[in-house]
Amino acid sequence: MPNYLFERFSDDYYRLINQTGVKQASPKQEGNEKYNSCWDGAISPDGTFYFSLSSEGGKCEHAKLVKYDYNENKIVDCFYAGDLILPNIRHLPASKLHTSINFLPDGRVIATTHSTDRAPHHKEWMPFGHHNHVWEGFPGSHILVYDPKTGKAENWGIPVPRESIYGAKYDPKHNRLYMIGFMRGHVYSYSLDTKKVMGVYVEDLIDTGEVYGDINQ
């Protein structure tokens, strides 16, 4: 009798989803064993596929932005969030880049961090019990920017203290980054021109019909 049950993440498991005309890649994971999820991926205007290596379920790790090398079938590091945000070991980690990878007109990649994993000494991820704590909490999501031309990344700071950004979208018309807050359910707007943050509205359908958000808690 044929066996239709395969071990999760085995070679047979991955082969099940192949379709005609679809190329499936399984690049090697050396150096990324602690990551167990991906919550965003986007193709840049030049055709490069960027995605986030994320941590949840007690891995206690900071996220990576990586890109896929099609010709070599390998994952290439762009930045490790832990190198950019100067984290405290007792804080909740910046474990994800969650639905926030965007591309600026000059080719740079901009994304925001989000936390859905526990600190190493916590027994469980309890964001609403910890995020406001000075030593045990979450200082806030960071805006991180990667320049593929130079290979350098930089931290633009925390737009909203004690808030975790659940998603972000760049608006080229107004040169703004719109962000949805996980803790408070608000929409925020960051101007790349003035470097100022403005609270737009409580998370909901905006009257203009231009900004939408969805938070599941």
PLM features per residue range, with description:
Residues 37-38, 63-64, 73-106, 114-116:
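Blade-loop segments of beta-propeller domains
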